[in-house]
Amino acid sequence: MAANKREPKVVVLGGGSWGTTVASICARRGPTLQWVRSAVTAQDINDNHRNSRYLGNDVVLSDTLRATTDFTEAANCADVVVMGVPSHGFRGVLVELSKELRPWVPVVSLVKGLEQGTNMRMSQIIEEVLPGHPAGILAGPNIAREVAEGYAAAAVLAMPDQHLATRLSAMFRTRRFRVYTTDDVVGVETAGALKNVFAIAVGMGYSLGIGENTRALVIARALREMTKLGVAMGGKSETFPGLAGLGDLIVTCTSQRSRNRHVGEQLGAGKPIDEIIASMSQVAEGVKAAGVVMEFANEFGLNMPIAREVDAVINHGSTVEQAYRGLIAEVPGHEVHGSGF
């Protein structure tokens, strides 16, 4: 008789809405431990099967999910690590993880952002801090609250090793949460970072009362900008019309639960960006990504009017009205091969 194989333990690092949602999904598939900084949140998850701070009182988590504030405990028992911490804290957590984690444990990022200062994608940081550990990203049109409430959704798991990606995808998959695989890590990560910037642009439009046609125009042209930069950075063109690109772009631009759309709306209401950030309980990655995206655009010689106008509002004192006037001033050219808005 064959010996029983131990089920791999998934360790999710981070206590926000999406990290908790993914942890609850994984706990329904196998042993899962979630590391959180807050003892109150850990107790809420363990005793009440809820993360009331980020998901409210109505979302009930898997009763097999356990939370801890002991980082060493979490790191030492991990067979798979899922990174749910924001981009600004991502590297620091990985550095601490490197002191405890055994070799070759796969590390999957949930973060759709770029590191300020280095302009690195999250998988690049994983490879730098944890060499030898397979790195991937899980991304797609995933509003955390909807997934946690059981609405049907899908994501794509991007890893260079498709055999490993196929094995790991089963840990995230449920009847209502479909998980596809791809080897285009660059494309998926680039799309995830860019869509946040474009959602801010659409949010600014909502604040101005623009029509549905105008919103569709901005989203469609945003997809072109996303694809141009993503391909220039090494992504595959076919990734961007998919879940991580167009799918995530649509939901982040249109959902009332979107943090980045909210930032755009608040900018349109005349609030300073620092005040908006301070009032939010979770991170809107598009705020930090806007300047980084423009650095890449300049590096590759690309005209990205939507990203440029968002960066101008967030970092250079422009107004929402000036941003949309700037877009309209762009002369339209060839829809596919043109360089303007």
Curated annotation (Swiss-Prot):
Keyword Iron: no
Domain of life: Bacteria
Pathway of action: Membrane lipid metabolism; glycerophospholipid metabolism
Compartments where found: Cytoplasm
GO-annotated cellular components: cytosol
Keyword terms of this UniProt record: Cytoplasm, Lipid biosynthesis, Lipid metabolism, NAD, NADP, Nucleotide-binding, Oxidoreductase, Phospholipid biosynthesis, Phospholipid metabolism
Catalytically driven reaction(s): sn-glycerol 3-phosphate + NAD(+) = dihydroxyacetone phosphate + NADH + H(+); sn-glycerol 3-phosphate + NADP(+) = dihydroxyacetone phosphate + NADPH + H(+)
InterPro entries the UniProt entry points to: 6-PGluconate_DH-like_C_sf, 6PGD_dom2, G3P_DH_NAD-dep, G3P_DH_NAD-dep_C, G3P_DH_NAD-dep_N, NAD(P)-bd_dom_sf
The EC number(s) this enzyme carries: 1.1.1.94
Signal peptide range: none
Database matches in Gene3D superfamilies: N-(1-d-carboxylethyl)-l-norvaline Dehydrogenase, domain 2 (1.10.1040.10), NAD(P)-binding Rossmann-like Domain (3.40.50.720)
List of catalytic residues: 195
Any one GO molecular-function label of the UniProt entry: NAD binding
GO biological process: carbohydrate metabolic process; glycerol-3-phosphate biosynthetic process; glycerol-3-phosphate catabolic process; glycerol-3-phosphate metabolic process; glycerophospholipid metabolic process; phospholipid biosynthetic process
Binding site for NADPH: 17-18, 37, 112, 144, 259, 283, 285
Binding site for sn-glycerol 3-phosphate: 112, 140, 195, 248, 258-260
NCBIfam families hit by this protein: PRK00094.1-2, PRK00094.1-4, PRK12439.1
Family stated for the protein in its record: Belongs to the NAD-dependent glycerol-3-phosphate dehydrogenase family.
Protein name (database record): Glycerol-3-phosphate dehydrogenase [NAD(P)+] 1
Organism per entry: Mycobacterium tuberculosis (strain ATCC 25618 / H37Rv)
